[in-house]
Amino acid sequence: GATARHNIRLRGGQCYALLAVGGQGLNDVDLKLHQGGNQIAADDTRTAFPTVRHCPSSTGRFRVEIEADGGSGRYFYQVFRRSAN
C-alpha cells in the first residue's frame, strides 16, 4: 500500500506514544518509527488504530512511517508525550 513519511523531533529523557487512525475505508494501517536508518518501533497488527511507544535517550530527529496495508482513504496521526511508567 501507499506509505507516508513524517519527520518529527523527540526530546531525550521523555517518553512518547504515537497513534495513527485510519479514516473511512482504511481498515489496516501500519505504523513505524525510525531513527537514522534503524526501525526502532513498529505496530503492523491488523488494525486501523496502530500505536507505538518510545523513550529516546537523547534528543533527535525521527521518521514516522504510516502505511495503508488494507483499504484506502485518509489517516490521522498524533504524538503524545507520556509519563515513563
Residue ranges of each PLM-predicted region?
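Acidic, Ser/Thr/Pro-rich low-complexity intrinsically disordered segments
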Residues: 1-76, 82-85
